[in-house]
Amino acid sequence: MSARRQELQDRAIVKIAAHLPDLIVYGDFSPERPSVKCFDGVLMFVDISGFTAMTEKFSTAMYMDRGAEQLVEILNYYISAIVEKVLIFGGDILKFAGDALLALWKVERKQLKNIITVVIKCSLEIHGLFEAKEAEEGLDIRVKIGLAAGHITMLVFGDETRNYFLVIGQAVDDVRLAQNMAQMNDVILSPNCWQLCDRSMIEIERIPDQRAVKVSFLKPPPTFNFDEFFTKCMGFMDYYPSGDHKNFLRLACMLESDPELELSLQKYVMEIILKQIDDKQLRGYLSELRPVTIVFVNLMFKEQDKVEVIGSAIQAACVHITSVLKVFRGQINKVFMFDKGCSFLCVFGFPGEKAPDEITHALESAVDIFDFCSQVHKIRTVSIGVASGIVFCGIVGHTVRHEYTVIGQKVNIAARMMMYYPGIVSCDSVTYDGSNLPAYFFKELPKKVMKGVADPGPVYQCLGLNEKVMFGMAYLICNRYEGYPLLGRVREIDYFMSTMKDFLMTNCSRVLMYEGLPGYGKSQVLMEIEYLASQHENHRAVAIALTKISFHQNFYTIQILMANVLGLDTCKHYKERQTNLQNRVKTLLDEKFHCLLNDIFHVQFPVSREMSRMSKIRKQKQLEALFMKILAQTVREERIIFIIDEAQFVDGTSWAFIEKLIRSMPIFIVMSLAPFSEVPCAAANAIMKNRNTTYITLGTMQPQEIRDKVCVDLSVSSIPRELDSYLVEGSCGIPYYCEELLKNLDHHRVLLFQQAETEQKTNVTWNNMFKHSVRPTDDMQLFTSISEGQKEVCYLVSGVRLNNLSPPASLKEISLVQLDSMSLSHQMLVRCAAIIGLTFTTELLFEILPCWNMKMMIKALATLVESNVFNCFRSSKDLQLALKQNVPTFEVHYRSLALKLKEGLTYGEEEELREMEGEVVECRILRFCRPIMQKTAYELWLKDQKKVLHLKCARFLEESAHRCNHCRNVDFIPYHHFIVDIRLNTLDMDTVKRMVTSQGFKIDEEEAIFSKSELPRKYKFPENLSITEIREKILHFFDNVILKMKSSPNDIIPLESCQCKELLQIVILPLAQHFVALEENNKALYYFLELASAYLILGDNYNAYMYLGEGERLLKSLTNEDSWSQTFEYATFYSLKAEVCFNMGQMVLAKKMLRKALKLLNRMFPCNLLTLTFQMHVEKNRLSHFMNQHTQEGSVPGKKLAQLYLQASCFSLLWRIYSLNFFFHYKYYGHLAAMMEMNTSLETQNDFQIIKAYLDFSLYHHLAGYQGVWFKYEILVMEQLLNLPLKGEAIEIMAYTADTLGHIKFLMGHLDLAIELGSRAHRMWSLLRNPNKYQMVLCRLSKPLFLKSRYKHLVQVLGWLWDLSVTEEDIFSKAFFYFVCLDIMLYSGFIYRTFEECLEFIHHNEDNRILKFQSGLLLGLYSCIAVWYARLQEWDNFNKFSDRAKHLVTRRTPTVLYYEGISRYMEGQVLHLQKQIEEQAENAQDSGVEILKALETLVAQNTTGPVFYPRLYHLMAYVCILMGDGHSCDFFLNTALELSETHGNLLEKCWLSMSKEWWYSASELTGDQWLQTVLSLPSWDKIVSGKGGQRKRSWSWFCPPNFSMVSWSQPQCA
């Protein structure tokens, strides 16, 4: 039975019949139009309140997950219940009108009495339904019902393509009046219905002053059997299902295929519905919350009661309305009788029908319809209401009876305006603003209180769309604000200034054309140009703005320009204009021809006989000749600059005149125009190709300029980074997009504004750690203050998810226009791509496209790339590069393009498309040009359809969701997949098997080698070797490894470089988002944690923080709290949070997180000395046991390994944190943490992990000062390495070891050995093709080379570092490069890259998220700049950069970069102290003591590393000499010299020697010593070529004040 029912439902005729009443389906109508049919029946009008409010609530919802589908479910939940009741009781649903419906019981007149009883019973049961249901979505849904009975007439009308029907007559008027009288839950009977019903069965309540009555309840006699009565009544209904069909709600569900009937019924159904039925798409596909324009037309007739009269009038009106709407892709949605009139509900912008300039077309259509219908003599009054906005467009009703309808406040507003403002075309403010028509086309109407509309806003009358010469009203539309800068358009203004200069110098015509899409800010550019042009003396700028209507008015542009030139724009009366004209043309034109100006300038010169005989063409020529003379006369007196906005609307005659004008006299014309929609006329083409024309295509604003714009628009000094990213990405650099996105955020109250606080006052927590805001450029600060000295900052409301926000209606409309202009296949491709995300690969798109082959897809993609829907990229590096820079403004050389032969153009286009196809084949990554398009297309899918496609995407991506092949496809969080069951439960077995083989669900053979070995270690270092011999042996070992890597690369060296960074963006992040969409929160959490871990590995703390935020939201949604996998995810989450906190220098938070993680991993870390002592004893015994163990146990299970690796990671961070603290007992905690890391790593039985632990343990003992212990563990590392096979991961272990040992040796001051090891590590990592590691080793190698003054080698390393930073687009390596360049300038006496270049890099990148949230590097850069300015004694600049550095000082991390940065910062503070002492500042001594304490603290810290001691002692010596403490100065200076000698630190030793010489000699330095030195610093190239002389090192960077040490005394400081 169900199969049969499904077969019936799939029939096209059944689907069509579901949109129509039985009255039409089974009707027999004559082919004449109009045709009339009369019958008797009962009408029920049901009005449902609450739907409009619900539609508004959904249409203004913030997030994309609250869309049309949810709304249609709620609407149909109620409406289908009503429809079902009506059908069960034998009714026929005639029409759905938004949130109301009209039902009919068609019977003979003698049956009316009984049928009314049935209908009343049905009405009461409908009310009962709603009383039982709870309010949905917080809205109270209630119904009002009106009933009428009597004589009904049906009118069928239309044209050859579409038919419509109406029911008219007294009963129809009565039923509407009855419903209007009803209150909530009332049933009202019309007077006639009350007359015809069985009064004995009905209890009523009288309505005062009305003949209609209200039904209270039915009161059947005790013996009354309603079922028998109902069955009897249904026998009189022609199409009530009975017998074999009694289980069907409607007989129309059983219709057999009948092509003739189907063709007939199709005429009653909208075209988009028929398309949906033909495409066999799911019901509901057309349900959307969609921006549309509603045109409500109401016709009132002179003889309302005569069907034949109104029938012909409606027919005439309908045919005309249909023809007008067809031109502009509008459609009639409903036609019904409405309060004594006939109403047409017309809609522009239905799915698939969206067109540009929709609002203008709607108004144009409305005016046309109004003009036509007003001429139909049988129509008394025509009233039209036009409203624009988001409404619900969708199929509403029951599966067996439904209609496509529109619901929303805008529908109501259009309907109310139509009734409250009769006899005119009225529109709302949104339509008025969106039309972009001149204000003089409209007149504001007085406000009226309209039923059901709380605040419609201003209402306007549309006066007509024929352009009139409104002198003084065609100025540029936008305003120029003195306090608002023109942002991001420097280049465009430069083009104007340059062209202007040429115009003035050559006295030759110039044309400057700015082409740009709507929203690019063309009008703003012209407004600025008008202002600049008017600043020059003897220059006259005439600026006008055209509209869409201007194009259709002959000679309109010249007419307006000449009116301005002649000064007519300021005249208040035609007589004044006439006098002005007479004075200007009397010498140029015979008086008898003055009347030539009558029409064009609205004057009244007497018409001469000669003029009346003149032909139209001759008049035009005379007029043009006169204008030429006037202009020739004017340009002799002053320079004329014509400025024309929206020049695409210049009419053809005006173009021809302009073309002639620029050839005849020197004139400067500036135009802005949107790209021509059609081929421009010959004259326009000629101007574009003229040698004196400069044609500029406007680019978008750059990210920094968008940031500036937002800060200026909001009047704030900073905005959140998340908001900045959202607006930069969402706007694509288009000013209008940015403004609309901001308005949308403001509308949803997402933005908060507060007084700016200093950063020192803010307590750092996890939630505010990354709330460092982005600021506008310095020159914008002036425009961002709310008042003098007061600044506000912008924040986001807590919990808001910007990326999930639904796009603003205005921007959605732009995307819908573009989508609807595409073919259906292209639309499908774009919608499928939208499911994948903003960025996607061709492989994944092909996977989810239904029934496409690769050739079809490539061809479609090429077209869409050409149409600027997608951008394509060969690699993720290209993508990242493109995202950093928006398309800039550029000049188009149409003259050279025009040289191509016309015959070749078509061929060229085809060739271009073929080239694009080839490019798409090569490019595997694509991205939506506009994120708004992706969001808009995504919202068009149904929930179930989305789920199917998200699942397809997830299954495809899972196979690659791990590290790249280069990194052996492992997890970013070691052994993560062993803990969390993320794949197997949802995938088929073939996929599972494939994934097992590709991803290593079991440990592969190579991993097994490193994880366990049954054989005892073969190699041991002989005990009698000296340190030198061991050193040579180690270096020789690494040399051998490098030799073997070079000699057999195929076995050892990976074929491709690391691709992990790319995989994060195109695989793992999209996969996490697909799982979020599928509500698979545990899987989504897994991948967000993987992402966070990966970004921490890549040094991107901000992204790690953001994805941990996503993870935290998902963790809160998980319910199975007792599962081990969830516990592990919590532990991972806390450990990753700890790592972020550690990197940001928030050690207290980091420690707290690590303790939480270890507790969840069942490794509680002691929190008091008693448990510490006990745990220390346990761990020492464990370590002894592991170290003395000769054979290893069986392999460790994957789950256990995951746990151990995470524990080891936590302990590694913990000992570093404890090492930072001075408290004596903290070193024991640090020692315990280091030992626990060691034991945990040994338990893994993995060589790589064990070697890492040995190296960590060695470093810990180095820094803690345990001289003998560290050596033992370094030997153990080498013994471990010597026992590994030379392949795969073992090579990486060896490279890692060389690199880490080199780093440790550098920290400890063994600079020669650090260089030896670093050089070998560099060669190994370069062969292993891992950019991240290669970058790190180059950075590390540069520092010992710098301190050893080995500049030739250093410059070579810097060259490699620069090449890497450019190739990989790596900001960290580029920043480090400039840091070393600054060091070279400050300390080495030559220039490798200029100071200006370094400073520019900092200015452009200081807000980069990797640098901003990386501890040390930005601190170092700021501090170096501050030191430079301090030496130049430019103290304002010094303070600026020193203050920036100061904010970063608090991020204390035990890293080399931090100590490099802090030592530069301290140097700046010491130089500032010198200034204070010279100026005898009051707090100088306090500052000196504070600086000395800070330096002593740095030296005392375990984590600092001896390599920094010489510099720190040097600074301490200088502070002492400044403060008059010669004894301490000697001590610190000598200590620093000894350490420099020991380390081989030639650079510091040289500086110390010079300081000693200067401080203890009688020599004096001049104040501008450093300035003189700066000016004579040689470049590296000059030094190499021998032209630069010696490097400048004959000066000291510390120039003590000009007074002897003995003169310093305590009172002076006070």
Curated annotation (Swiss-Prot):
Activated by manganese or magnesium ions. In the presence of magnesium ions, the enzyme is activated by bicarbonate. Calcium mildly increases the enzyme activity, also in the presence of magnesium ions. It catalyses: ATP = 3',5'-cyclic AMP + diphosphate. Residues 42-179, 293-418 form the Guanylate cyclase domain. Disruption phenotype: Mice are infertile because of a severe sperm-motility defect. InterPro entries: A/G_cyclase, Adenylate_cyclase_typ10, Nucleotide_cyclase, P-loop_NTPase, TPR-like_helical_dom_sf. CDD domains: CHD. Its cofactor is Mg(2+); Mn(2+). Belongs to the adenylyl cyclase class-4/guanylyl cyclase family. This is Adenylate cyclase type 10.
